[in-house]
């Protein structure tokens, strides 16, 4: 399983990834798209990730890329 | 701008390929991809899964690039739309830094092969545009174009590697 670009987020990311991978194969691909069992784990992971994107100054790069769309 | 097009086929059903694609990092053929983060993920009104990921690539930078701009790391944005009904995965990837040197875009479409729906066909389109002047830009684009087929083989081997590793898919 891949790491987060910010080391301290890797545990939360891997927990979320495990949930998502299982959801993708066993729910999404089988047409069960309304099941949201990984939302809480995604939220936790995102809290960590978005803080890190700010601290490590990646946010401006993302904003510039989105502006170009 | 330089453009590269390619079509290929995987001897595995679309469901397995799309699962492997989503979890293709890390793999020994993409050791330069050091991290993959999910920035955004949602299901749209048509039931399609949208994902935006941030990839960080490290090392493996040509000497002229590191000399020119002190490049050793690059941030890549990857967006995908997965339609399980249509059995289609669309992706686009592009760098969001070092844009003064190069903008590299890659588009892929994965869908069941027309002749045999237990196989998966991939269509790839890559574009390289460098804003550098004095003929340098053209050289950069040419360099990328020359290296791309090899990278493509690597990324496909990576997907197959992950596919083998998780044989229990779906």
Q: Would you name each region that the model predicts?
A:
Chain B
Residues 1-61:
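Hydrophobic ligand-binding cavity/cleft-lining segments
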Residues 2-7, 64-72, 83-170:
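Terminal "cap-and-tail" regions of soluble proteins that handle hydrophobic small molecules
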Residues 15-16, 79, 123:
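Generic detector of isolated residues embedded in canonical secondary-structure elements
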Residues 33, 75-77, 105:
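Short edge beta-strand segments in beta-sheet-rich domains
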Residues 39-93:
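Glycine-rich portal/gate segments that line the openings of hydrophobic small-molecule binding cavities
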């Amino acid at each position: 399983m891949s790491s987060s670009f910010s080391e301290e987020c890797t545990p939360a990311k891997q927990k979320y990834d495990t949930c998502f991978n299982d959801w993708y194969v066993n729910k999404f691909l089988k047409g069960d798209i309304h099941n949201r069992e990984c939302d809480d784990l995604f939220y936790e992971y995102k809290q960590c990730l978005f803080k890190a994107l700010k601290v490590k100054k990646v946010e401006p790069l993302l904003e510039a890329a989105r502006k170009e769309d | 701008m330089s453009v590269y097009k390619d079509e290929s086929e995987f001897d595995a059903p679309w469901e397995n390929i799309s699962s492997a694609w989503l979890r293709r990092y890390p793999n020994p053929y993409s050791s330069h991809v050091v991290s993959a983060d999910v920035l955004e993920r949602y299901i749209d009104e048509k039931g399609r899964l949208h994902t935006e990921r941030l990839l960080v690539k490290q090392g493996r930078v040509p000497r002229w690039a590191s000399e020119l701009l002190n490049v050793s790391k690059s941030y890549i944005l990857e967006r995908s739309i997965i339609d399980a009904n249509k059995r289609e995965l669309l992706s686009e990837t592009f760098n969001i830094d070092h844009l003064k040197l190069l903008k590299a875009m890659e588009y892929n479409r994965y869908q069941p092969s027309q002749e045999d729906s237990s196989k998966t066909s991939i269509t790839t389109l890559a574009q390289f545009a460098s804003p550098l002047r004095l003929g340098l830009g053209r050289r950069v684009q040419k360099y990328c174009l020359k290296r791309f087929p090899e990278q493509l083989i690597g990324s496909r081997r990576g997907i197959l590697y992950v596919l083998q590793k998780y044989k229990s898919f779906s």
